[in-house]
Amino acid sequence: MITGATLDHVAVAAERWEDAWPRYAGELGGRWISGGETSGFAAHQLRYDNGAKVEIISPHLVEHNDFLRRFIDRNGVGPHHLTFKVPDIRAAIAESEDAGYRPVNVDLDDPYWKEAFLHPKDAPGVVVQLAQSSTEWSSPAPAGIPAPVHDRTATLDRVVHAVASLDEGLALFVGLLAGAEVERSENWVELAWDKPGRLRLVEGHSDWIGPRRGRVHHLAFTCPWLDDGPVTVEPEDNLGTRLLMFPG
């Protein structure tokens, strides 16, 4: 088990940052934290009312690194990875290997951000990023990002991840990544860490998962401006990511 692991954010792939702004910044009220560009992708993060974060990533300088371009060409836009912050990346890599996972794309060169990934073929259908960083990044918001439409920001309550095997999902997210079980039903388990936002593993949804071992099903938000609900925004209407929006 990776002691001290915490769920930091969910990352969503889009062709351009700007494509995601009307929904995630305007309607849901995500507040800009930081953004930047590097070989292969550009990323920026938005924070919601409870502190939970969404990262939008888009292809950039793909001639140097085309991993995200290939992902979008193969799968379309939508959920890409879950990032877990860890206190010691080398220990986390060793724990992962001991548990039978194969860390890939290990990068320990940057003194401010060290990372490794667990491939979705090893994990239940989602890329898991392990990252060590003591820095809280911030940067000026870019021109053109919309102001929140509503007076209050939504809260990002949970990421709901459909899995073919609940036991397999728990082996990763509890056995390795130290999630604490906070709720359980017949076919799902909800996990929490010491940061905002939760992960709910749901067994089933074979029509959505298809031949995969798992797939992010939706992001659940509480939206104070809703009087009736919940409201479902289907993937085709939100850049490949389903949203469930609940009144609150």
Model-derived segments and spans:
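A short, polar/proline- and glycine-enriched secondary-structure boundary/capping micro-motif
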Residues: N65-R69, S139-P142, E181, P211-R213
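Residues that form or immediately flank small-molecule/cofactor binding pockets and catalytic motifs
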Residues: E37, L61, L108, T135, ...
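Core segments of cupin and vicinal oxygen chelate
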Residues: I2-A5, A11-K53, A91-K114, L118, ...
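Anionic group-transfer/hydrolysis microenvironments
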Residues: A11, I57, T83, K121, ...
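Conserved donor-binding loop and adjoining core beta-sheet/short helix segment
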Residues: S34, A52-R69, G204-D207, P247-G248
